[in-house]
A protein has these predicted regions:
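Acidic, low-complexity, intrinsically disordered peripheral segments
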Residues: 13-28, 44, 101, 438-554
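Transmembrane beta-strands of outer-membrane beta-barrel pores
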Residues: 97-103, 138, 315-319, 341-345, ...
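Residues that define the transmembrane beta-barrel architecture of outer-membrane proteins
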Residues: 126-130, 329-333
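Outer-membrane beta-barrel translocator domains and adjoining extracellular loop/strand segments
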Residues: 103-110, 146, 258-261, 306, ...
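Regulatory alphaC helix of protein kinase catalytic domains
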Residues: 32-58
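A glycine-/polar-enriched beta->alpha junction
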Residues: 57-67, 74-90, 124, 131-149, ...
């Protein structure tokens, strides 16, 4: 029992002696750092003070592209007010004054009384006119109704365009946020690698002086050290570029960023993604609204040939201007109705209708082009997400294998079974595996955000809770209430009853003969041969003299 206790007390001393002997045989022992976990797992010592939610809230409130698009939508909504004004009364006040001085001739003087001629040989007249006119359209032939339909369709397209810009801003923000986190970690990895190589170079230099290593070992370490410096410089430049992108989108510098949170509303299958995009993609919805506006313009063009009926009443005064005496002014009241019937416009209306139909056909084709583009974008985003997730699984295994490879190479190097190059290569493999893993995590997250953008689900009010949201309808409500009159809805209802309906034309199709279509074979001489240079000498340029410039002849 006592022997066992004594043996246990000597065990630590024996271990210390063994380690001292190993250090004497291998001076580089314990100078290489142990394999480190990737930074994504090891975690930082500094607590995050910035988050994706805070960045989204700041960008939603201050991003200039998003704010500019809101004002673009407001300007589009103002067209609704312009259309509504066509059914509201128009009030004008007109005031005019006139002064006439006549130097009469013999014929005029002969007709004038002698007293007038003696009192003032000249004839002076002054007059003051004032008129208040009120005109109320009763029937515009559908012009007002058509203009209102076009304006509302344009307003709907503007709302979808605003959603699209918001999605673009958020996808840029999420990409910049992920880039800053990824590139910051890459800078840490490159810095750690540089410090490790500097320590390694010191040890190799010492061992070479001791005769244990060759000049080749030293050159290998020096080469890897300089490569590490270049890689660190590139990583730092990329990190600053990512920070600049963040500042451009958010309007402030990023802090210590927290990990990206899970994104909500992701589809469970590709088929579900296609169904959501078909009904909710803002680009497609904007194209459909623009096509509706173009269709309404057909009816608006037709309405230009319809009769217009309006009521007009005036109240005015006319009398001497100087001296102004109210009792000397005549008061005149007039009232009437005006019916205007277009009979011939020289083909202008028919041309406008044809023009509107052609524009509608173009918008309809743009809808199909947008739909195809949306499908392509959904496919690309989905596949990027799937590919990134697959790469993540493989790169997790790659990182673990690289860590084992590095640890094993280091232990074997201590035993003299591995060369300096083997250890350097293993350390570099571990670094690159960590960087590849960070890149794949970023690609996966950004691909998910890009997919949500195409589905119309990447919006601030869907991502944030209890965040103030911009309400575009508030401004439109104010536009509709400007100068509103109680009888306005009645006039609009009467005008819309007879408003013409725009009928789109059939889009002309070009027949395709894909079975017999062939690429024309080039002539033999059209095949490129040797490289050529510009001909030398260049042809001389004739400079005209002064006579030629001034238009004369030599």
């Amino acid at each position: 029992m006592a022997l066992a206790t004594a043996a246990g007390g000597f065990a630590p001393l024996v271990d210390d002696i063994a380690r001292a002997q190993e250090r004497s045989l291998n001076p580089v022992h314990e100078r290489y750092p142990e394999p480190q976990l990737p930074l994504a797992e090891a975690g930082g010592k500094t607590s995050p003070n910035d988050s994706l939610a805070a960045a989204i809230a700041d960008a939603y409130a201050t991003n200039p592209d998003l704010a500019a698009q809101r004002y673009v939508l407001r300007a589009t909504d103002d067209e609704v007010g312009v259309a509504l004004a066509q059914t509201r009364p128009r009030i004008d006040l007109q005031v005019s004054g006139r002064y006439d001085l006549t130097l009469p001739g013999d014929v005029t003087n002969a007709a004038r009384p002698i007293s007038d001629r003696l009192n003032d040989p000249n004839i002076e007249r002054d007059e003051l006119n004032s008129q208040l006119a009120i005109e109320q359209p009763l029937f515009t032939g559908g012009r007002a109704a058509g203009a209102l339909r076009v304006a509302r369709a344009q307003s709907a397209a503007g709302r979808e365009a605003l959603r699209g810009v918001e999605g673009d801003v958020l996808i840029n923000l999420i990409a910049a946020y992920s880039d800053v986190r990824r590139d910051g970690r890459i800078v840490e990895i490159r810095s750690r690698n540089l410090r490790w190589l500097e320590a390694t170079l010191d040890e190799i230099s010492a061992r070479r002086e001791a005769g244990e290593l060759t000049r080749t070992d030293l050159a290998q370490a020096e080469t890897q050290l300089e490569i590490a410096r270049v890689q660190l410089n590139g990583a730092q430049a990329q990190f600053e570029a990512s920070r600049a992108s963040f500042v451009a989108t958010v309007g402030r510098a990023p802090g210590i960023l927290a990990p990206e949170p899970d994104l909500p509303n992701l589809p469970r299958s590709a088929d579900e993604a296609f169904r959501i995009a078909e009904t909710n993609n803002p680009d497609l919805a904007a194209a459909l609204a623009a096509q509706r506006a173009a269709e309404e313009r057909i009816g608006l063009a037709k309405s230009e040939g319809r009769p217009v009926l309006s009521l007009r009443g005036t109240a005015g005064t006319i009398g001497p201007a100087l001296p102004f005496v109210p009792d000397d002014q005549d008061v005149i009241f007039t009232g009437g109705a005006t019916l205007t019937i277009p009979l011939s416009e020289g083909g202008r209306i028919r041309s406008r209708v044809a023009q509107a139909r052609n524009e509608e056909s173009a918008e309809r084709l743009r809808v199909e082009a947008t739909r195809r583009g949306v499908i392509q974008a959904v496919v690309n985003s989905w596949n990027q997400w799937v590919t990134a997730e697959r790469n993540l699984a493989a790169q997790e295994l790659q990182r673990k294998a690289a860590a084992i490879f590095y640890e094993g190479s280091l232990e074997e190097y201590r035993e003299g079974l591995r060369s300096t190059f083997d250890v350097l290569f293993a350390q570099n493999s571990l670094n690159e595996a960590e960087i590849d893993l960070l890149a794949s995590r970023r690609e996966s997250y950004v691909a998910r955000a890009a997919l949500l953008r195409q589905l119309g689900l990447l919006e601030a009010d869907r991502l944030l809770t209890n965040a103030p949201a911009y309400d575009p309808d508030a401004y439109l409500d104010r536009v509709e209430q400007r100068n509103a009159v109680p009888w306005g809805p009645v006039v609009r209802a009467l005008d819309s009853l007879t408003a013409p309906i725009g009928k789109p034309q059939k889009v002309a199709e070009i027949e395709s003969d894909a079975q017999t279509a062939r690429i024309e074979e080039p002539a033999p001489q059209s095949v490129p041969g040797e490289l050529v240079s510009s001909p030398s000498p260049q042809p001389a340029i004739t400079v005209p003299d002064r006579v030629d410039i001034e238009g004369g002849s030599r």
